[in-house]
Curated annotation (Swiss-Prot):
Function: Protects cells and enzymes from oxidative damage, by catalyzing the reduction of hydrogen peroxide, lipid peroxides and organic hydroperoxide, by glutathione.
GO molecular-function terms, A-Z: glutathione peroxidase activity; identical protein binding; mercury ion binding; selenium binding
GO terms for biological process, alphabetical: hydrogen peroxide catabolic process; response to 2,3,7,8-tetrachlorodibenzodioxine; response to corticosterone; response to molecule of fungal origin; response to oxidative stress; response to selenium ion; response to xenobiotic stimulus
GO-annotated cellular components: extracellular space
Pfam family, one: GSHPx
Protein name: Glutathione peroxidase 3
Homology family: Belongs to the glutathione peroxidase family.
Oxidoreductase is among the record's keywords: yes
Native species: Rattus norvegicus
Tissues of expression: Secreted in plasma.
SUPFAM superfamilies membership: Thioredoxin-like
Length: 226
């Protein structure tokens, strides 16, 4: 009887969303802080070929999904899903931006000029070409982290309590808000303010559902205000 009651309680908690995440208390996503000063439009980055500096204010009025990517990661196949996400939600104002990084397991070892050929012929392979903008390889954590990543991380709580195995993480100093692994994601709203942050293992399909849900809520609020 006690076992049945325990199972019933756990099921109720799971359905209500109250069961704590496993493996070090991960959360599939976190909501970003309100009231942070500044916007993402104060920053920008060089494209992967180094030929153009793109100020992020170029994307004003759109939803921007920031993703730190890697070519030789167990999650590299997310590139395929990100292409599909860009194609599906692009007409609704979503822009995906990818930022190669070699700080997690040394899984982006090549030069900038080697990354696109690697994606095309190795992983995901099969002639794959990203349909979203990639930028120059750089750090997302540590002393030399790109400033816009400092802004994003300070705007949103981390998705996991633990950073991971120090032997596979290549930066110093380590901080609580640091990105945990390749393919962590941040969504920034049309006003340049961060909205959500996703754990790297959260599926792209779940990310899509979260984005669509948020877009619908904002559309409903806008309709009421008219």
């Amino acid at each position: 009887m006690a076992r049945i009651l325990r199972a019933s309680c756990l099921l109720s908690l799971l359905l209500a969303g109250f069961v704590p995440p496993g493996r070090g208390q991960e959360k599939s996503k976190t909501d970003c802080h309100g009231g942070m000063s500044g916007t993402i439009y104060e920053y920008g980055a060089l494209t992967i070929d180094g030929e153009e500096y793109i100020p992020f204010k170029q994307y004003a009025g759109k939803y921007i999904l920031f993703v730190n990517v890697a070519s030789y990661u167990g999650l590299t196949d997310q590139y395929l899903e990100l292409n599909a996400l860009q194609e599906e939600l692009g007409p609704f104002g979503l822009v995906i931006l990818g930022f190669p990084c070699n700080q997690f397991g040394k899984q982006e070892p090549g030069e900038n000029s080697e990354i696109l050929p690697s994606l095309k012929y190795v992983r995901p392979g099969g002639g794959f070409v990203p349909n979203f903008q990639l930028f120059e390889k750089g750090d997302v954590n540590g002393e030399k982290e790109q400033k816009f990543y400092t802004f994003l991380k300070n705007s949103c709580p981390p998705t996991a309590e633990l950073l991971g195995s120090p032997g596979r993480l290549f930066w110093e100093p380590m901080k609580i808000h640091d990105i945990r692994w390749n393919f962590e994601k941040f969504l920034v709203g049309p006003d340049g303010i961060p909205i959500m942050r996703w754990y790297h293992r959260t599926t792209v399909s779940n990310v899509k559902m979260d984005i669509l849900s948020y877009m619908r809520r904002q559309a409903a609020l806008g309709a009421r205000g008219k």
